[in-house]
């Protein structure tokens, strides 16, 4: 399965196994993100497309704050918050 990250320079898909927690998914990007994991801001792909922008999705409360126990879902779009 895949999750997505998005920013100014690129949008990227990352492949993970089903049942992967948010910190372990963060580790696919960089071990420092996994080690310093604080939370993940998550929205489903379908919700983002429906709303048209992250700003509108946030205004409607569709962006969730998830912790270390969160199990990643297919098509999640994620912004990882971390501190190392």
Model-derived features with residue positions:
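C-terminal-of-GTPase-core extension/linker across diverse P-loop GTPases
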Residues: 1-71, 83
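Structural motif
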Residues: 73-77
């Amino acid at each position: 399965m895949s999750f997505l990250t998005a920013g100014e320079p690129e949008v990227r898909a990352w492949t993970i196994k089903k049942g992967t927690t948010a910190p372990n998914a963060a580790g696919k990007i960089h071990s420092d993100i996994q080690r310093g994991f604080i939370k993940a801001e998550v929205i489903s792909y379908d919700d983002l497309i429906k709303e048209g922008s992250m700003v509108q999705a946030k205004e409607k409360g569709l962006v969730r704050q998830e912790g270390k126990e969160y199990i990643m879902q297919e098509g999640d779009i994620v912004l990882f918050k971390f501190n190392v």
